[in-house]
């Protein structure tokens, strides 16, 4: 997984563990995917949690729009009912705020609303492809500040570490008019009711492998998962710069004056 059980709370309850987030153009809108429950997708969704897609339309790493999915406890057949809310403005950053209900349904069913929103929540095959030899080589290079050594990798023998495994997925397809911007920033979070009027953010995820490759354990995975993207530059900028600076010299060569590439 690109974001697999990287906090103590996520390890305790994989229903709150985000493995990957995907964003792409669909047939009739933008598709948002949040995968959770890596390697244990039969546990469903937590009934006291918020599963949220945060959308930044202002290029300031602050949500202007949030799609929130909540679930009720599992029924005797194992399925759960869910509600999708849309929150805008100040409500998009307030977990105690109420939004406009966009859709409702049950897990394992595709729901399509009159305004074109499509929703699915349920089990799915894990689409994340990762070859163990390649990721080990990259992690070793970042750790040691050395060139990436792929001498042991044969592309013809590439093997997916997660072939045949499942996740629990939340998939939204949202028409452009409900997003309101052509360029957006997106991340997903899970948060758990603390029973004291607040919410404890358990996991966050956006681009794959960021927390794994750059080893944010130096600052603490739990700290990373509890913070927001708007604070990343201050919290993790030096860490990322240091690791990239150590890796770049061994993997590049200085240009020769007057030389041309052939």
Where are these regions (language model features)?
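Surface-exposed extracytoplasmic segments
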Residues: 1-262
């Amino acid at each position: 997984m690109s974001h697999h059980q990287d906090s103590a709370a996520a390890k305790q309850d994989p229903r709150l563990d985000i493995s990957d987030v995907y964003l792409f153009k669909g047939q009739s809108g933008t598709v948002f995917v949040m995968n959770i429950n890596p390697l244990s997708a039969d546990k469903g969704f937590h009934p006291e949690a918020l599963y949220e897609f945060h959308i930044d339309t202002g290029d300031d790493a602050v949500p202007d729009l949030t799609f929130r999915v909540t679930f009720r406890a599992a029924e005797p057949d194992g399925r759960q009912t869910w509600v999708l809310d849309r929150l805008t403005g100040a409500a998009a950053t307030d977990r105690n705020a109420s939004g406009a209900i966009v859709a409702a349904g049950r897990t394992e069913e595709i729901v399509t609303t009159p305004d074109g929103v499509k929703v699915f929540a349920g089990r799915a095959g894990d689409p994340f492809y990762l070859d163990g030899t390649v990721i080990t080589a990259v992690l070793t290079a970042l750790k040691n500040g050395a060139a990436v050594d792929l001498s042991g990798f044969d592309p013809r023998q590439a093997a997916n570490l997660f072939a045949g495994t499942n996740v629990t997925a939340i998939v939204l397809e949202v028409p452009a008019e409900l997003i309101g911007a052509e360029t957006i920033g997106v991340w997903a979070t899970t948060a758990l009711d603390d029973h004291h009027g607040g919410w404890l953010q358990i996991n966050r995820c956006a681009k794959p492998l960021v927390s794994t490759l750059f080893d944010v354990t130096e600052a603490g995975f739990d700290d990373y998962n509890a913070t927001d993207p708007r604070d990343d530059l201050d919290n993790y900028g030096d860490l990322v710069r240091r690791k990239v600076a150590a890796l770049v010299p061994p993997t590049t060569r200085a240009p020769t004056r007057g030389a041309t590439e052939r």
